[in-house]
Swiss-Prot record:
GO biological process: 1,6-anhydro-N-acetyl-beta-muramic acid catabolic process; amino sugar metabolic process; peptidoglycan turnover
Molecular functions (GO terms): ATP binding; kinase activity; phosphotransferase activity, alcohol group as acceptor
Alphabetical list of SUPFAM superfamilies matching this protein: Actin-like ATPase domain (SSF53067)
Xref: HAMAP family: AnhMurNAc_kinase
Domain of life the protein comes from: Bacteria
Annotated EC: 2.7.1.170
Family (UniProt): Belongs to the anhydro-N-acetylmuramic acid kinase family.
Broad enzyme group: transferase
Pathway: Amino-sugar metabolism; 1,6-anhydro-N-acetylmuramate degradation; Cell wall biogenesis; peptidoglycan recycling
Protein's job: Catalyzes the specific phosphorylation of 1,6-anhydro-N-acetylmuramic acid (anhMurNAc) with the simultaneous cleavage of the 1,6-anhydro ring, generating MurNAc-6-P. Is required for the utilization of anhMurNAc either imported from the medium or derived from its own cell wall murein, and thus plays a role in cell wall recycling.
The gene coding this protein: anmK
Protein name: Anhydro-N-acetylmuramic acid kinase
Keywords of the record: ATP-binding, Carbohydrate metabolism, Kinase, Nucleotide-binding, Transferase
Length: 384
């Protein structure tokens, strides 16, 4: 079966579209990437999305217009990724997250979380003529979960190893990890874990945009940060903050790691008189150190391999810093195992859609998200 996975992550770089051929179900799941491309948002739309993510108030009418514009962009990406390739029979669209609030565990009750993704599936189905599964996070939230991360079950069946302990580390705007125990052990699936590790590229990207007055949006290959020296005192101070100490299940987003958060970090840095490259090196160090600290705090087994994916997988300096913190683990990318590091998340939502519509298989892992039970994920929309 041919399926398209669509996602725009917290970096808001554009829409990742993956056309895949898929067969099997879980242990026999097989994926072939036929075509994968990233389609940038129109600059004006991207700017509006970033403003919303940053908490800028807008009217309901404006929100509806942006929802429409995102859905149209996603539909266009789905149409274009098929050019010259077999026609897809199914779309799995994550949409664009603009707000994410994890559940609050009170003394007497649990306040359910909330996660809003724009780009409604009904319009995508109508514009493409292809059945579309979307709104994947709602069912997990209704069951008391974090609704994030949602890809660990897909990671488990695509990237686990018979004898190795692995971590699949996505570094998008936010970092998230899937811990995969050896899959030859009895009940190994129950030992799969996952959570958000903290900032991925989001603070680095915001700093780059500020330093270049918007002329650059990211640190290409980490070259700018590599010229500097990280301030370890600052990194230690930041890692004492509440999120980094919180026990999984946990999730986060631009609501926490926001321009205001970066501004506070900048104020913290003033006594150290950092150069621009030192500043970027320090923010990069926070990403690497938060990932490593998260492993050391919450994973008891020694990690044989770390499989990096997402935009951060192209940042050589960041991977070097991660290797410095975790010298006993081999740092690879998912490309090394045949799964595109650029499109792994898009592939995952294609798989989740396939599990939902074709197989009737649950997509979340309760031990990862904190949900009361495994759930069928996603709303199904058929074309008119």
């Amino acid at each position: 079966m041919y399926c398209i996975g669509l996602i725009s992550g917290t970096s808001v770089d554009g829409i990742d579209a993956a056309l895949i051929e898929i067969s099997g179900t879980e242990l026999d799941l097989k994926i072939d990437l036929i075509s994968g491309k990233t389609y940038p948002y129109p600059p004006e739309l991207r700017g509006k999305i970033i403003e919303i993510c940053g908490g800028k108030p807008i009217s309901i009418e404006e929100l509806a217009q942006i929802d429409d514009a995102i859905a149209q962009s996603f539909a266009q990406a789905a149409i274009m990724v098929q050019n010259g390739h077999p026609h897809a029979q199914l779309i799995g669209s994550h949409g664009q997250t603009v707000f994410h609030r994890p559940p609050v565990l009170g003394e007497r009750e649990i306040k359910l979380g909330y996660s809003l993704q724009l780009g409604r599936g009904s319009m995508i189905a109508h514009l493409t003529g292809i059945p579309t599964v979307s709104n994947f996070r709602a069912a997990d939230i209704a069951a008391g979960g974090q609704a994030a991360p949602l890809v660990p079950k897909v990671d488990a069946y695509l990237l686990s190893h018979p004898t190795h302990h692995r971590c699949v580390q996505n570094i998008g705007g936010i970092g998230n990890v899937t811990y995969l125990p050896p899959n030859q052990k009895p009940n190994w699936e129950q030992a799969v874990r996952g959570w958000d590790t903290g900032p991925g590229n989001v603070l680095i990207d915001l700093a780059i945009q500020k330093l270049t007055n918007g002329q650059q949006t990211y640190d290409n290959n980490g070259q700018w940060a590599a010229q500097g020296t990280p301030c370890e005192s600052l990194v230690r101070k930041w890692l004492e903050q509440e999120f980094f100490q919180q026990t999984p299940p946990k999730s986060t987003g631009r609501e926490l790691f926001s321009p205001a958060y970066l501004e506070q970090c900048w104020q913290d840095a003033q006594p150290y008189h950092l150069s621009d490259s030192d500043w970027l090196a320090t923010l990069t160090e926070l990403t690497a150190a938060s990932i490593a600290q998260s492993y050391q705090q919450f994973i008891k087994a020694p990690i044989d391999e770390i499989l990096v994916c997402g935009g951060g997988s192209r940042n050589t300096y960041l991977k070097q810093r991660l290797a410095n913190y975790l010298p006993n683990s081999q740092i690879l990318t998912t490309d090394d195992l045949g799964i595109s590091s650029d499109f792994k998340e898009a592939i995952a939502f294609g798989v989740l859609a396939y599990w939902r519509l074709v197989c009737g298989i649950t997509g979340n892992l309760p031990q990862v998200t904190g949900a009361k039970q495994a759930m069928l994920l996603g709303d199904i929309d058929h074309p008119v």
